[in-house]
Structure formats: structure tokens, C-alpha cells
Curated annotation (Swiss-Prot):
PANTHER family: UPF0398 PROTEIN SPR0331 (PTHR38440:SF1), UPF0398 PROTEIN YPSA (PTHR38440). It comes from Streptococcus pneumoniae (strain Hungary19A-6). This is UPF0398 protein SPH_0478. Belongs to the UPF0398 family. The lineage of its organism: Bacteria, Bacillati, Bacillota, Bacilli, Lactobacillales. Transmembrane segments: none annotated.
Length: 175
């Protein structure tokens, strides 16, 4: 059973502040294409951390594909307090992360930075691959986690990059 951890840029990192942004259609098209390939490679579980942006968009697409491709979806939040201060729209998105096949919380609340390190290690040890929207040339807080993934033995990383999106956009506009 192949399990992929889903991580990537936040909507804020990408400057996408509206669910109606036309760039989302292209991003979701790339996600669908990648998820189809991952399903063909045997990925059956997608594991989320509950972040808005790329993770949420993958969740939306995976839920659309769930019946046809048999995906199982899990959200493992770092803390039970995750998202409690979010606005109403984001609370609705958070509720979708909680309406999956498996939901757990690593800790009741944040107490010290060691919890995040242990949480990341737990995620790496309990998945055997990742689906990551991350480009080393556009670093964010994911840089440390990405490095840990690369150092993890026998850990497959499927990346979506800006170059791939640009190529898809060029092909999309030609058709």
C-alpha cells in the first residue's frame, strides 16, 4: 500500500486569494494529471496536514476522483487547535479536511518547537512518498521538510513545479 504525504505552497505564498482565480483551473488540471499517474503507480492513501492552498486543492480534486480511483484520504493535524482562528470561509475548508476517511491530531495544543519536529518525523515514517508543490528557487518554510524528505531512505518525491505549470499553461493555451 503506497501512501503519499501531500504538502505544498499556501495560497498566500502563491498570491491566490480567491477561489475564483483563473490560475486555480490550471493548477487543478496539473493535480488531476499527477493524481492519475500516482494512482497508476499504486498510491492508495493521500495524507494531508490541513493546510490551505495546494493541500486543499489536492483534497478537492482527490475527493472528485475518490470513487473512480479508490483513494483513501487522511488528515493528520499537528494540533487540535489547528485553524481555530480562521475566518468563516476557511473554517468551511477546514471542515472538508475533517470529513475524510481518517482524522487524527498529534497533540492537543502547541507547547514547544520539538513537537513540530517530531510531528514531521512521524509523517515521514508513516508515508512512503510525497506529492509536493515546491520549487527550490522559491523557498518557503517547506525547505527544511523537503530536505528531510530527500534524506529519507527509499522515499519517493513527486514534485509539481512552476516550470511544469508554465508548460501546461502553454499547451493549454495552444488547444
Amino acid at each position: 500500500m503506497a501512501t503519499a504525504l501531500v504538502l505544498g505552497y499556501s495560497a498566500f505564498d502563491l498570491g491566490l486569494f480567491s477561489d475564483k482565480d483563473p490560475r486555480l483551473k490550471l493548477i487543478k488540471k496539473a493535480i488531476r494529471k499527477d493524481l492519475e499517474a500516482m494512482a497508476a503507480d499504486g498510491v492508495s492513501w493521500l495524507v494531508f496536514t490541513g493546510s490551505l492552498g495546494f493541500e486543499y486543492w489536492v483534497l478537492e480534486v482527490a475527493q472528485e476522483m475518490k470513487t473512480e480511483y479508490g483513494f483513501q484520504l487522511a488528515t493528520i493535524f499537528a494540533f487540535e487547535t489547528h485553524g481555530e482562528n480562521w475566518n468563516e470561509d476557511n473554517q468551511m475548508k477546514l471542515s472538508r479536511f475533517k470529513q475524510v476517511d481518517f482524522v487524527k491530531y498529534a497533540y492537543p495544543r502547541y507547547e514547544h518547537k520539538g513537537q513540530l519536529r517530531d510531528y514531521q518525523q512521524f509523517l515521514l515514517e508513516n508515508t512512503n512518498s510525497s506529492y509536493l508543490f515546491y520549487d527550490e528557487e522559491n523557498e518557503t518554510k517547506l525547505a527544511y521538510f523537503y530536505q528531510k524528505m530527500k534524506n529519507q531512505e527509499d522515499y519517493f518525491i513527486k514534485r509539481l513545479t512552476f516550470d511544469q505549470l508554465n508548460e501546461l499553461a502553454e499547451n493549454f493555451s495552444e488547444n
